[in-house]
Amino acid sequence: MEAVIREGGSLPQVRSASRNQQRSGESTKGRKWEKQLRSEMRRWRRRKWPHLKPLAHPAISAEQLLAVIAPQPRPLLLLMWGVVCILPWRGWESSRARGVTHLGGRNSQGRSQGTRVWPLGRP
């Protein structure tokens, strides 16, 4: 095992470096190694969830919209803003009206509950 690590064989380089440091009596994990790991994790998180980037502040976007549609009369502007606000919620509302939560037969913790089985359609 030690020989494999010393030669830098199948095990990754990070591991061998930490093992060598341990042998020489230094700290197991240097700050550089920790930083590298953290940055790598951050990169992975960014790649996995690109949609979690912080959105522009709603007030700012509203002001921008106002600036763009300044010449038009106010009622039209209000109508447009209402449409913009409502659009994202429409799908969610319609599915809620049918009694479908987006957890799909699961409770708030995401655990599944015992779903009833109706033999001949819903009563």
From Swiss-Prot:
Native source organism of the sequence: Avian leukosis virus subgroup A (isolate RSA) (ALV-A RSA)
Domain of life: Viruses
Ranges of compositional bias, category Polar residues: 13-25, 106-115
Coiled coil: none
Biased composition (Basic and acidic residues): 26-38
Protein name according to UniProt: Putative trans-acting factor
Region (Disordered): 1-38, 100-123
